[in-house]
């Protein structure tokens, strides 16, 4: 059977990873204004996220505006949104399934093999959710890099990575690690001897008992 310590570690890493995914999805700092070129204006820092854009003044004032219409957003941002939401939902579902199959829980404790397989299934679901988040973060980062090095992009509209995308990346990788630990909870099949006990051995044992 699987080691309960490994299962607990995988569960903890997955839980922290899911929290990181949620926090990273909510925060607006997915990309921030890049200070490049000769004329650099540092009075205002612009942040853009999946749900809103913010402007941070040098005076310490922060103004945020939620995106009004989904249809006005580009397809890349909508795809990133969808993948992050799917990744979070699938990861939470996988964590719930894995918690049922962990050795430290009492649910279904009568069947040890089925319980371990349940934990393994939860780990696989977690890996699927983490993969969605990794693809979303990587695709968003690819678009930021492509726009940054595009010579036709105005200097004042160039962006670089913000803190939120790194939080989401870290959460997804923790989710992958935790899901892999839970998915490794594969039950070992019991080894059955291929050769039954011979009749001669049984008769010899019986004759020995008679002489005792």
From Swiss-Prot:
Highest taxon, organism lineage: Eukaryota
Entries under Pfam families matching the protein: PMP22_Claudin
Region (Disordered): 191-212
GO biological process terms held by the UniProt record: bicellular tight junction assembly; cell adhesion; head development
Extracellular side: 29-81, 141-162
Subcellular location field: Cell junction, Tight junction; Cell membrane
Membrane topology, as annotated: Multi-pass membrane protein
Gene Ontology molecular function: structural molecule activity
Keywords per UniProt: Cell junction, Cell membrane, Membrane, Tight junction, Transmembrane, Transmembrane helix
PROSITE patterns: CLAUDIN
Gene Ontology CC terms, in alphabetical order: bicellular tight junction; plasma membrane
Cysteine-cysteine disulfides: none
Topological domain ranges for the Cytoplasmic compartment: 1-7, 103-119, 184-212
Ranges annotated as spanning the membrane: 8-28, 82-102, 120-140, 163-183
Family: Belongs to the claudin family.
Function: Plays a major role in tight junction-specific obliteration of the intercellular space.
The name this protein goes by in its record: Claudin-7-A
Organism the protein comes from: Danio rerio
């Amino acid at each position: 059977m699987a080691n309960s310590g490994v299962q607990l570690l995988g569960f903890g890493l997955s839980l922290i990873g899911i929290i990181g995914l949620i926090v990273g999805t909510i925060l607006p700092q997915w990309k921030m204004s890049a200070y490049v070129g000769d004329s650099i204006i540092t009075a205002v820092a612009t942040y853009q996220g999946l749900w809103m854009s913010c402007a941070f003044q040098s005076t310490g004032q922060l103004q945020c505006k939620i995106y009004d219409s989904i249809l006005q957003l580009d397809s890349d941002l909508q795809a990133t949104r969808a993948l992050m939401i799917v990744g979070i939902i699938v990861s939470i579902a996988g964590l719930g399934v894995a918690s049922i199959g962990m050795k430290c829980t009492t649910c279904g404790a009568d069947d040890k093999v089925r319980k371990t397989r349940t934990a393994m299934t939860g780990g696989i679901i977690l890996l699927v959710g983490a993969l969605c988040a990794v693809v979303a973060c990587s695709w968003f980062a690819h678009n930021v890099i492509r726009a940054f090095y595009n010579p036709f992009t105005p200097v004042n509209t160039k962006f670089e990575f913000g803190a939120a995308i790194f939080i989401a990346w870290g959460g997804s990788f923790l989710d992958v690690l935790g899901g892999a630990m839970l998915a490794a909870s594969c039950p070992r099949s019991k080894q059955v001897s291929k050769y039954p006990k011979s009749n001669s051995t049984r008769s010899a044992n019986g004759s020995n008992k008679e002489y005792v």
